[in-house]
């Protein structure tokens, strides 16, 4: 059963601006420790940050909380399955919170164009 949906659109110009203003601190605020390890090897670092920012915002909207408490940027990770499909992974605190809410899965779809990134998430009970 669908619990909630969330979508987010991010301008790459906005991510460039934030990256210039805050430097590495911006990436450290948005990315999980695992993502921070991948980040230096990203072919398009701005797109890497933008996709993760949009996906995490979409996740927070789908579960109905916004970014707060256990639903934090650093507790929501983005990876890919063996076929390249994007998927969420969670820090233990967020896994526990999702279980308490009865949310069994949150699916993710992402897309990007020249100057924008879109993420769409569906939370299921």
Swiss-Prot record:
Residues that hold Mg(2+) according to the record: 8, 57
Lineage: superkingdom: Bacteria
EC number of this enzyme: 2.7.8.7
UniProt GO MF annotations: holo-[acyl-carrier-protein] synthase activity; magnesium ion binding
One term under GO cellular component: cytoplasm
Recorded name of the encoding gene: acpS
The entry's keywords: Cytoplasm, Fatty acid biosynthesis, Fatty acid metabolism, Lipid biosynthesis, Lipid metabolism, Magnesium, Metal-binding, Transferase
Family (UniProt): Belongs to the P-Pant transferase superfamily. AcpS family.
Cystine residue pairs: none
HAMAP family reported in the protein's UniProt record: AcpS
Protein name: Holo-[acyl-carrier-protein] synthase
Cofactor(s) this protein cannot do without: Mg(2+)
Enzyme class: transferase
Role summary: Transfers the 4'-phosphopantetheine moiety from coenzyme A to a Ser of acyl-carrier-protein.
InterPro entries to which the protein is assigned, alphabetical: 4-PPantetheinyl_Trfase_dom (IPR008278), 4-PPantetheinyl_Trfase_dom_sf (IPR037143), ACPS (IPR002582), Ppantetheine-prot_Trfase_dom (IPR004568)
Gene Ontology biological process terms, A to Z: fatty acid biosynthetic process
Compartment annotation: Cytoplasm
Catalysed reaction equations from the record: apo-[ACP] + CoA = holo-[ACP] + adenosine 3',5'-bisphosphate + H(+)
């Amino acid at each position: 059963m669908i619990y909630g949906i969330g979508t987010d659109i991010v301008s790459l110009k906005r991510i460039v601006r934030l990256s210039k203003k805050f430097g590495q601190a911006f990436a450290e605020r948005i990315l999980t420790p695992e993502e921070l390890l991948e980040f230096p090897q990203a072919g398009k670092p701005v797109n890497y940050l933008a996709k993760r920012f949009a996906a995490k915002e979409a996740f927070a909207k789908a579960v109905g909380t916004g970014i707060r408490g256990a639903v934090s940027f650093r507790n929501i990770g983005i990876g890919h399955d063996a076929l390249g499909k994007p998927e969420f992974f969670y820090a233990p605190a967020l896994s526990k919170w999702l279980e308490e809410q009865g949310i069994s899965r949150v699916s993710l779809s992402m897309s990007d164009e020249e100057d924008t990134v879109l993420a769409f998430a569906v939370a299921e009970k």
